[in-house]
A protein has these predicted regions:
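C-terminal catalytic subdomain
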Residues: 302-421
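Short, well-structured alpha-helical segments in soluble
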Residues: 65-77, 94-97, 262-271
């Protein structure tokens, strides 16, 4: 899937319902109800410049609702923003709820700090009073959402600025949902026989989450390694050595072996149009084919809004990809290692390829031997990798897991602490969670998970919650 489709503005259908009974009512100075609503619409649209809007005009009649449905369907909107501009007859709204194809919707009610009128004795003030009856319209319309019933509707209320921010959050989740349905997961080349808990149902993956899955054989991997040009290998090797210090005990020929193993994955992802590359980096066939496991993370994945994850964990790959789509940031793949109760912290990280390309933290990366496999008999045993002390700061930690045909999305906030490189073979950091560390993991153990999580700078729990609700996931925000 090309980058432009993954990084575009969310497409929203704007559904604004108003009363045909009030439409032509007029005051002597400030125009008709319709004139005032047209001005209100311009203010609403101007607050949504972060969206690619489909706006069919104010919905007064059945024909307006039908026009809106056709426009939204033709334009393949990611979601719908629905708002009553005052009290209104509800026939057009109910028809829309019944007939509009399934798409997420955010149903909004906007409150004002203060009314523009004190009494309704003046005719213009009376029209303003009618225009201000958004609450009665929303209350009237809310029951039909449940009675139809209409799935995937989020109800929000607040000032215009507050509602706009909630729409912004919702839009990121809705775009992610749409992109997932056109994405491709590439698994090289089989499930992880060492970790059965990572297995998921691939039919459900497509029908309930969206991506297709393609299996990428090791025979292809070997061919991609073999056809790498010397110039291509040298270019990437020089890029890495110019950016990062290489430790003295790294053998250069083994470094080149790892560069080749990494570049072949990038080229396979590119040629097969893979958005989420799930790499079984501990399978013996990986080492037999490449002589080592890939240890670097080509910037191509970030440029293409794609991800690369290890250990054949499709669920962990998906949550990494979701966070990539939502945030556009560098996302890291971790497993919690151990708790240090004295400090209220846990160590976490992972071996294998991990995104080390954050431009602000290039000083946290060393090219170091993968000592875990240094004493094996594989061709490039002890080949190096990008040893990354994961960037400090507050992060969202999230995991996605399958249980009996349902999915669970678990997230929390953790602080990555600054410090030196500590754990050989693993990109890593020390985390201090906002929840007391023993309580956090006891709660996760009771929910039931696996060991793999994605972490990214910032708080994205609101976006993850909206996405989970759209996708029908169980959602756990541990705080």
């Amino acid at each position: 899937m090309n980058r432009e489709l993954k990084s575009r503005k969310p497409k929203a259908g704007l559904l604004l319902i108003a009363s045909p009974r009030f439409k032509n009512l007029s005051g002597p100075q400030r125009g008709t109800y319709n004139d005032r609503k047209l001005k209100a619409v311009e203010d609403i649209k101007s607050s949504m410049d972060f969206l690619d809007l489909s706006y069919p005009g104010i919905i007064y009649e059945r024909e307006d609702a039908e026009k809106a449905m056709k426009m939204f369907s033709d334009n393949e909107v990611d979601f719908i923003v629905a708002e009553f501009l005052s009290w209104s007859e509800d026939f057009a709204w109910i028809r829309f709820l019944r007939d509009m194809p399934a798409v997420p919707m955010i149903f909004t009610n906007v409150v004002k700090d203060k009314m523009s009128f004190e009494t309704t004795l003046d005719e213009d003030d009376f029209i303003d009073y009618l225009c201000s009856g958004t609450l009665v319209g929303s209350l009237e319309g809310s029951g039909s959402i449940r009675r139809i019933p209409r799935a995937n509707v989020k109800v929000v209320m607040g000032t215009r600025d507050e509602v706009t921010e909630k729409i912004r959050v919702f839009s990121k989740a809705a775009l992610t949902r749409s992109v997932l349905r056109h994405s491709t997961v590439g698994l090289m080349a089989n499930m992880n026989e060492a970790m059965w808990s990572t297995y998921i149902d691939n039919y459900d993956l497509f029908t309930k989450i969206g991506p297709e899955i393609h299996y990428l054989p090791y025979s292809d991997y070997g061919e991609y390694i073999a056809k790498l040009s010397d110039a291509e290998v040298k270019e990437y090797a020089d890029e890495l050595t110019s950016r990062y210090k290489m430790m003295e005990d790294v053998a250069y020929d083994k470094f080149i072996g790892c560069v080749k193993a990494t570049l072949a994955i990038k080229n396979m992802a590119k040629d097969n149009d893979i958005d989420c590359f799930v790499y079984n980096d501990i399978d013996r066939a990986t080492f037999k084919t490449a002589g080592c496991r890939a240890g670097f993370y080509p910037q191509w994945f970030n440029d293409n809004v794609s991800v690369l994850v290890p250990e054949a964990d499709i669920g962990a790959g998906l949550v990494t990809y979701m966070l990539k789509l939502i945030t556009g940031k560098n996302v890291n793949f971790i497993e919690p290692f151990h708790v240090e109760d004295e400090f209220g912290t846990f160590a976490g990280g992972h071996a294998g390829p991990n995104d080390h390309n954050d431009p602000e933290w290039q000083g946290n990366v060393l090219i170091a031997r993968d000592v875990r496999f240094a004493k094996t008999s594989w061709k490039y045993a002890g080949a190096p990798f990008a040893w990354y002390r994961i960037s400090p700061g507050m992060k969202t930690m999230a995991g996605l897991y399958e249980e009996n045909g349902k999915y669970k999305l678990i997230c929390t906030q953790v602080e990555s602490l600054p410090g030196k490189h500590l754990l050989a073979t693993y990109s890593h950091t020390i985390f201090r969670p906002v929840v007391p560390v023993k309580d956090l993991f006891e709660r996760i153990l009771k929910i039931g998970a696996t060991q793999h999580y994605a972490v990214v700078d910032g708080d994205w729990t609101a976006e993850l919650q909206d996405l989970a609700e759209m996708m029908g996931f169980e959602f756990y925000n541990l705080k």
